[in-house]
Amino acid sequence: MQDNEPKNSEGLTREDTPLAAQQCGKGINSITEYLFVNLPFDSKPSDEMIATLPDAEKNAIAKMAHFFLQARYEESAAEAKRCMNSQHPEVNTFALLAHILNHVALNNMEVVQKDFQDLRQRTQHPENKHVAALNDIFRFALSVFFHLGEATAPISPESFSHCSEGSRLYALYAQSYALYLQQEYAQALGMAEAALMMDANRHEVICIYLNVLASMAAMSLSYFDRADRFFLNALRIAKPMGYIQPFIGHHGPLQGLVEKHIRDREPELYKMISDKVMLFRHGWTEVHNPQSQDKVTNLLTPYEFALAMMAAKGKSNQEIADYLNISINTVKAYLSIVYQKVGITKRSELKNYLVK
């Protein structure tokens, strides 16, 4: 079949064109702007630094992020591999982070372990304060994402002063996530909302993640209407570009939001997300479980996991049924299957086999 879709100057179809390249007035540099700081005391501001990057490298950075957000892990990993050879530590460390996450999804754990060792070495020997700040954020974000944050030092205040606006907002997302893991749901929600107000829709990718985080916290507080609103905001931004990864990586803590808003309305999209959830969760647990007392199960389907998360977070069978528009008997049947699969008899034991 002939592809009649118009292509841009670099030979990419719209499907392959990163979000950065399609934002009017921003161009492909909008992804790299997250990595290079632009503050009054900088001797070399962001625009000048970015101008030194070859076009091919800027495009590779944007494609790496774009493919990952679309859950196209092999393609993203290939672009990350290219970017890991960059002479700029801001770029090659960011690429290493992406390389780790892609290979978690691909279940290539030997690659993941090697990359983690490399990242630890880099964080111990940063080239300058800006690179040290980015390393600090990446270190913290990875620990939070894999739910290993109990013994992790927080992001230092100094790191915020040496980062771009986009990186600072990403750091606020990570800190909000950490508060969520500490069950400080009201604080997590407040921080995410404040960051969204600061963002003012300037950074769409980060805005997706902040809305997802806010919806997680709101669900944990049983603020169902607010959770719906934040989730639908994230979906509204993400869907036109096929950015499903935020909903894959946060599926468990979203506690049924994916099921409520996507499962019946868009079954093909839900199947795509569910298939990737199973793949990604397997790799995620390979990182998380050996380093945590909580052993997250891989035995549940995404739908079973979502219902189990709602039950573990204190939702009654009636609340689950009302929220997902199913019968109480259906809820009971699914929870019975969950108990059987993980080998428990009490609702209170669920938390030992699920994400936080």
PLM-predicted stretches and their roles:
Residues M1-Q87, V91-T93, M109, I244, ...:
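Flexible inter-repeat linkers and adjacent short helices
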Residues Q23-N38, E57-R72, N92-N108, V131-L148, ...:
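Tandem amphipathic alpha-helical repeat scaffolds
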Residues N29-D47, A65-K81, V104-D118, S143-S156, ...:
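Helix-turn-helix repeat elements of alpha-solenoid scaffolds
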Residues D47-A56, K81-N92, Q117-H130, I155-R168, ...:
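Solenoid-like repeat scaffolds
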Residues A80, A98, A192, A308-A311:
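Small side chains
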Residues A141, G149-S156, S167-P302, Q318:
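Linker/hinge segments immediately adjacent to helix-turn-helix/homeobox DNA-binding domains
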